[in-house]
Amino acid sequence: MSEPTGKILAIMGAVVDVEFPDGHLPKLNHALVIRNGGERGDINLTLEVAQHLGNNQVRCIAMDSTDGLRRGETVYDTQAPITVPVGEPVLGRIFNVLGETIDGKGPVNSPVSLPIHREPPGVANVDPATEMLPTGIKVIDLLCPYARGGKIGLFGGAGVGKTVMIQELIHNIAYKFGGYSIFAGVGERTREGNDLYHEMIEAGVIDKVAMVFGQMNEPPGARMRVALTGLTMAEYFRDEQGLDVLLFIDNIFRFTQAGSEVSALLGRMPSAVGYQPTLATEMGYLQERITSTKKGSITSVQAIYVPADDLTDPAPATTFAHLDATTVLSRAVFEKAIFPAVDPLDSTSRILDPNIVGREHYEVARGVQKVLQRYKELQDIIAILGMDELSDEDKLIVARARKIERFLSQPMFVAEKFTNLPGVFVDPKDTVKGFKEILEGKHDDLPEQAFYMVGTIEQAVEKGKKLLAEVS
């Protein structure tokens, strides 16, 4: 059956209007292709149908640059959405939004390809996540534990360490977990994707990872859809092979940003702060597909850029509703040189529940937050009147809070070359034990510096003894 053809009517940046003959209008979300277009016949471009305008015209979003495209060019209707290869042949390879390889190693010969637009699992098939996923990062495992098969958000402004955290989590979870992982680079720096690829080769895990990139330099159409490409690959492993898959997305804000860029060109009236009016719908469509079913699970870790450090901005605020755990990276913590710069009072998790993590873990976590909250309340008094005006009880709380703050830091594997400190993976049981001992006052005699950038409490005690020996 021959492909219906249309003609380009108008080109507005990343948006292209196409006219088709009567009775051959392509469906929404179907892919249209331009073959050997442009003056030199060197343009091969995929468009996705976004709107029906009437008069047999459709408005489409381009998945690549429209430079050199001309009105009147022939457009072919593929009569299907964008389809991408899935299954084990995709592992160890790098793809673009269309499922084409971009690592210079030739095409992928996968017997199965799936459309990137799919329905989320039905309510009866969804399996709620209630098991903790150890990350080896103390502040996360203690205060905002991640659920296996859950959705996790890393919130932070510019330059507070979201990508480093994603890379550390890939190191700690993907390498130890041993299952398959999908990494979707959405609108971020190409350099970071390149670094990650080479790190995975060095670590010997590249054959268990598929990487999909639609980076900063690409048109908004590619950045809008690349997360769906990565998700489709993850869904196949979950649904057809019954596996537990890890899906890393860096950065989900760029997905929203790309939608915002395209929205105005599509003629939609902008909503709050200039975002697209369909923001909640687009986010829900993506997030509802990232879930655990009776067959397998997708555990997703999503970095979320927070514009101007404002968590009430519509883009991060819309994402909040979908997450099981939120890890908030704070500039105030970053300025204290505590890394990872996780805000222990803002970060939350649905599974920080005594029935899931255990009574001891829950009580230690709440005890830590209580001490840190009291310290935060006392900071104004300390700033105005000084420490001497505090009661003995408050002085003790301040001393323990400062130790807890420092003990929430730890050396990271992916930052070894910058810090010259070997990275550590701390078992959640050791994390709970360490903070419990600080809360009980067992280490009140040690200097607070002993707790900075160490793994377990035993390492802190050893470091403290060395510091005391140097002083004496």
Swiss-Prot record:
**Major site of localization recorded for this protein:** membrane
Coiled-coil ranges from the UniProt annotation? none
Query: According to its UniProt record, which reaction does this protein catalyse?
Result: ATP + H2O + 4 H(+)(in) = ADP + phosphate + 5 H(+)(out)
The transmembrane segments are none
Q: Where in the cell is it found?
A: Cell membrane
Q: Tell me the keywords, alphabetical order.
A: ATP synthesis, ATP-binding, Cell membrane, CF(1), Hydrogen ion transport, Ion transport, Membrane, Nucleotide-binding, Translocase, Transport
Indicate whether Endoplasmic reticulum appears among the record's keywords: no
Give a GO cellular-component term: plasma membrane
Q: What is its EC number?
A: 7.1.2.2
Q: What family is it from?
A: Belongs to the ATPase alpha/beta chains family.
Self-association and partners: F-type ATPases have 2 components, CF(1) - the catalytic core - and CF(0) - the membrane proton channel. CF(1) has five subunits: alpha(3), beta(3), gamma(1), delta(1), epsilon(1). CF(0) has three main subunits: a(1), b(2) and c(9-12). The alpha and beta chains form an alternating ring which encloses part of the gamma chain. CF(1) is attached to CF(0) by a central stalk formed by the gamma and epsilon chains, while a peripheral stalk is formed by the delta and b chains.
Q: What is this protein called?
A: ATP synthase subunit beta
Question: Where does this protein come from, organism-wise?
Answer: Symbiobacterium thermophilum (strain DSM 24528 / JCM 14929 / IAM 14863 / T)
